[in-house]
């Protein structure tokens, strides 16, 4: 009997250790330091501090439905009803969204860049890869429409987790924008985790994912199965441009292809030749901008 208890205790200890480790890695993924992001963007020529400081803008605070504040910056150099919201990727912050905002400023849009929960200056205790973030995005959309009018022309651009968040918002809550640009989204979080685990430790994800999911449900009150953009993409009617690098080895381009294939209505697809994950714009600037221009011309602007 004592041996049985020791065995059961060892199994329980193993499961608990795996569960805590996996859920911690997901909930508290190490974020990039803001100084690192600023210096990276400056050195690459994607951030000009002087030009940015000279923009007409204001810092805003928008309450999340989960009790923390979302920190955002509203940039309004133009007297226009055209706005775009930029949704950044995991471990990044709104500084990394400036390059995308500039792309739209050059096309006559005003913009909002903001920090996801637990990123940048926003509150929030953990990261949920789109599950809670989609409700925060709705708060940003609601605030903008309340302040600027429901008749605005609104676009949302998302990168990586930010793109997945955008799809979960548009397909799972409300199709609240006039157009969307999804840059390197994952189609299903469980499928992504399975791939990443196999790449990192050469073991099938089915060993670890159920344990991680059990602990996520207990600690963060969400389930991995609920983070599945592919389950919601067909509910989005507004036009969407899908972008992905062919050489992305973190979120495979096949995931974007699946999303594109299932999306109904107006849509376009652009596969960038150069760059790895979330580098399509950085490594293919002219082609990226042309893809955006072609999309806007065909589906958004007459």
Specify the residue positions occupied by each region the protein language model found.
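An N-terminal hydrophobic leader/cap segment in hydrolases
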Residues: 4-63
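The serine-hydrolase catalytic nucleophile loop
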Residues: 90-103
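Alpha/beta-hydrolase active-site loop
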Residues: 127-148
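Hydrolase active-site cap/lid region
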Residues: 168-222
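Short beta-strand/loop motif that positions the catalytic acidic residue
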Residues: 235-237, 242-244, 248
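Catalytic histidine-centered segment of alpha/beta-hydrolase-like enzymes
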Residues: 275-289
